[in-house]
Amino acid sequence: MKKLLLNTLIGLALLTCQTSFAQKTKAKFSPIKVETPARPANQQDVIQLVTPKLETVRVGFIGLGMRGPGAVERWTHIPGTQIVALCDLLPERVENAQKILEKAGLPKAASYAGDEKAWKKLCERDDIDVVYIATDWKHHADMGVYAMEHGKHVAIEVPAAMTLDEIWKLINTSEKTRKHCMQLENCVYDFFELTSLNMAQQGVFGEVLHVEGAYIHNLEDFWPYYWNNWRMDYNQKHRGDVYATHGMGPACQVLNIHRGDRMKTLVAMDTKAVNGPAYIKKSTGKEVKDFQNGDQTTTLIRTENGKTMLIQHNVMTPRPYSRMYQVVGADGYASKYPIEEYCLRPTQVDSNDVPNHEKLNAHGSVSEDVKKALMAKYKDPIHKELEETAKKVGGHGGMDYIMDYRLVYCLRNGLPLDMDVYDLAEWCCMAELTRLSIENGSAPVEVPDFTRGGWNKVQGYRHAFAE
C-alpha cells in the first residue's frame, strides 16, 4: 500500500513538473506583439480604392539623383501624361532633368531646388495629380504624407517606409484622404515573375505552399554614388532586412497576401557584419565597431493559411545578383535564379500546348522547348500589350516602364492600382519586425494586420483592366 501511494505521489509530481514546464515553454515562445492602432473614427479602408478618372495624369517629381532621372525619361514615353514640376536639392540635377524634357520635345517643367523644403511647394501646387518620390529612404514617408494631405496621389520609391510609425502614418493618411499611395516596386513586373504569377493564378503549380525572394546584390561598386553616403550610413545604424521589397513583392502576390491570406508570424536572424566595417575602414580610414547590419539577413514567415516564405538580404558579400524567386506548389515549381526553370507533373499541362508533355516529371526541370511553350501560353496580358515598348524604353529590362505605365493606366481608367498602401506596409514592415526578432534572439514576431480586418475581403490577387 505504501509502495502504491509512493508511486502515485511520484507520478503526480512528474505530471506537475511536465505541466509547469509546458506552461513555461509556451510562455517563453509566445510571439512578440507590436501595437496595431485603432482606425480613426469615420475612416474606412482603401482596399480596391478607385478614384475619378484622370484624362491627363499630371506629375511632379521629387528626387533626381540615382532613380529620378530614369523615371522622368520613362514618363516622356507614356501617353496621357504631363510632367509639371521637377524638384531636387541640387539645382544642376533639375537642369539635367529639364534636358530630358527638351530632348523629348516637351515643354519645360517648373523647377524647385536649392532649399530643403522646396519639395513642399511642389506638393502644394494645384495642377499636379501625382507626386513621384525618388529621394533617400528617410524622406519617403514624410513626403508621401504631406503630398496626400495636399490632395495628391503618391508613388514612392522602395522602401517607402522604414518604421511601423511611418507605415501607419501612410496608411491613415491614404484612408483619410482617399488618395492612392503606391510603392514603386518594379520587380512584380519582371517577365518571368509575372508569367509565373499568371501560371499560379491558373493553377499550373497546384496549391502554392511556399515562396522565396531576396535582394542579393553586392553594392561595393555603387556605395560611392549615394548622396552623402546615405545608404551605407543607414546600414551602419540599422539591423534587420532593410531592403526587402524586391523579394517580398512577387512572393506576396503569389500568396494573395491581404487578398485571402495574411502574414502572421516571422522569425529572422543575421550574420555578423564583416564587409560593411571593412568598406568604411578602406574608404575613410575609420574603425567601426558597432556596424549594425549583418552581411546576410534571413527571414522565415508563416501565413494565416499555413503557407511559408523565405526572404534574404545581402548587399555585402561577393555573390551573383539574385532575387531568389521561387514558387513551390503541390504540383509544380518555378525558379528564376540562377537559371529560369519550371518543374511540373505531366497532369499540369495540356498536351496540345506543350511538346513532349509526357516526358515531364516531378524531379527534373522541363526542357527549353517546354519552358518556351509554357511562357508563351501563360504570358500575362500586361506583357502582351507592353513587352515590345517596354524593352525599347528600358528601365531594368522594361519592368520600370511597365510599373509607371500601369500606374498611369489605372489612374486614367479609374481602376484600383496594382499595388496599394497595404502592400507597401506588408513589404516595408520587414525592416522593423526583423530587427525586433533578431534583437530578441530570433524570437517569433507577429505581423500586424495592416488592413485592420479587411485581409479576407478580396479573394485572390488580380490586375485590373478597363472593359
Swiss-Prot record:
<dbReference type="Pfam" id="PF21252">
    <property type="entry name" value="Glyco_hydro_109_C"/>
</dbReference>
<protein>
    <recommendedName>
        <fullName>Glycosyl hydrolase family 109 protein 1</fullName>
        <ecNumber>3.2.1.-</ecNumber>
    </recommendedName>
</protein>
<feature type="binding site">
    <location>
        <position position="243"/>
    </location>
    <ligand>
        <name>NAD(+)</name>
    </ligand>
</feature>
<feature type="binding site">
    <location>
        <position position="88"/>
    </location>
    <ligand>
        <name>NAD(+)</name>
    </ligand>
</feature>
<dbReference type="InterPro" id="IPR036291">
    <property type="entry name" value="NAD(P)-bd_dom_sf"/>
</dbReference>
<feature type="binding site">
    <location>
        <begin position="137"/>
        <end position="140"/>
    </location>
    <ligand>
        <name>NAD(+)</name>
    </ligand>
</feature>
<feature type="binding site">
    <location>
        <position position="215"/>
    </location>
    <ligand>
        <name>substrate</name>
    </ligand>
</feature>
<feature type="signal peptide">
    <location>
        <begin position="1"/>
        <end position="22"/>
    </location>
</feature>
<comment type="function">
    <text>Glycosidase.</text>
</comment>
<dbReference type="InterPro" id="IPR049303">
    <property type="entry name" value="Glyco_hydro_109_C"/>
</dbReference>
<feature type="binding site">
    <location>
        <begin position="157"/>
        <end position="158"/>
    </location>
    <ligand>
        <name>NAD(+)</name>
    </ligand>
</feature>
<dbReference type="GO" id="GO:0016798">
    <property type="term" value="F:hydrolase activity, acting on glycosyl bonds"/>
</dbReference>
<keyword id="KW-0378">Hydrolase</keyword>
<comment type="similarity">
    <text>Belongs to the Gfo/Idh/MocA family. Glycosyl hydrolase 109 subfamily.</text>
</comment>
<feature type="binding site">
    <location>
        <position position="231"/>
    </location>
    <ligand>
        <name>substrate</name>
    </ligand>
</feature>
<dbReference type="Pfam" id="PF01408">
    <property type="entry name" value="GFO_IDH_MocA"/>
</dbReference>
<keyword id="KW-0520">NAD</keyword>
<dbReference type="InterPro" id="IPR050463">
    <property type="entry name" value="Gfo/Idh/MocA_oxidrdct_glycsds"/>
</dbReference>
<feature type="binding site">
    <location>
        <position position="186"/>
    </location>
    <ligand>
        <name>NAD(+)</name>
    </ligand>
</feature>
<keyword id="KW-0732">Signal</keyword>
<feature type="binding site">
    <location>
        <begin position="243"/>
        <end position="246"/>
    </location>
    <ligand>
        <name>substrate</name>
    </ligand>
</feature>
<dbReference type="InterPro" id="IPR000683">
    <property type="entry name" value="Gfo/Idh/MocA-like_OxRdtase_N"/>
</dbReference>
<keyword id="KW-0326">Glycosidase</keyword>
<feature type="binding site">
    <location>
        <begin position="66"/>
        <end position="67"/>
    </location>
    <ligand>
        <name>NAD(+)</name>
    </ligand>
</feature>
<dbReference type="GO" id="GO:0000166">
    <property type="term" value="F:nucleotide binding"/>
</dbReference>
<feature type="binding site">
    <location>
        <position position="321"/>
    </location>
    <ligand>
        <name>substrate</name>
    </ligand>
</feature>
